[in-house]
């Protein structure tokens, strides 16, 4: 089973590379390689450092088709890779991102993934499906990044989304992924938080102690 999980993760990296380079029509774009290297390292670290049960939970289908919003999010993710490839490699619509900013955004993408891995490391119930994992004895997690915000995984997602387009050197890809993905993450945060306050024992008390959903001092 774990071997199959490795293959799924590897195929996702390959799909990202194919979308970028096929759209660009060239592999001679260093920024794309740096972006994919971060992606690959995240996958390797995930399997090396995280609980195998958590990885299986993350990849489970949830017994039904993924919610429409999640499917749209996945499509937007791939679409922004294709747009970045077309922009940088072929048409140069908006590929004037300064090198220094591209470097900062690559670092921000890496930081976002690091935050997500930290959240998954301390929270063995971290799931892509909104549900109470009674089969795994789910309880409230208050350590690590959960001591500062209630949904650090979505905070990480916002960092990655905000920085991904400029990291790839395309303002157009940045606009696409931010406009269509940020509302999804905010909606998902609100929906999940309401669900947990009703369904997960102790979560309401935790929410009273940790006031911020995504960004300390803001929201």
Give names to the regions the model predicted:
Residues 1-146, 155-219:
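Membrane-anchoring alpha-helices and their flanking helix-loop junctions
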Residues 149-150:
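Conserved SAM-binding loop
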